[in-house]
């Protein structure tokens, strides 16, 4: 039984009902429907902190999904899980892969910037200011891309760019 049919969360149930209606209305193949079911179940597991289950569902959705745009969101969510688990190198890889398929994911650019900024702070704590500056410069580039896609969002990043002289 798909996870979405047993989940007690009101929002998840509502999303599942709406998604099922849309899947009936919009012409889709059985493979696309199955991929979406795995994706939806992955999101449900992820929202509950069941990352291993979420990853299994996302990997299965990736196996079935052929649309690059839809795959970008699956890859992005896999990146989120790796970020949550502190696996920043893996997370960056999945965010890059998501952006290869959909370059209009400001949240992926933002998350990549956050990881780079974090690594810059780690380098400072280790006494390596040169490496820190390189990480901060990379964070700035990613934040600029996120901001250019969604002006008015990422206010803290925008302020950091101004304060550090990296906006421009």
Swiss-Prot record:
GO terms for biological process: photosynthesis. Keywords: Chloroplast, Membrane, Photosynthesis, Plastid, Repeat, Thylakoid, TPR repeat. It is found in: Plastid, Chloroplast thylakoid membrane. Pfam families: TPR_1. Signal peptide: none annotated. It is a peripheral membrane protein. TPR repeats lie at residues 35-68, 72-105, 120-153. Its main location: plastid. This is Photosystem I assembly protein Ycf3. It comes from Coffea arabica.
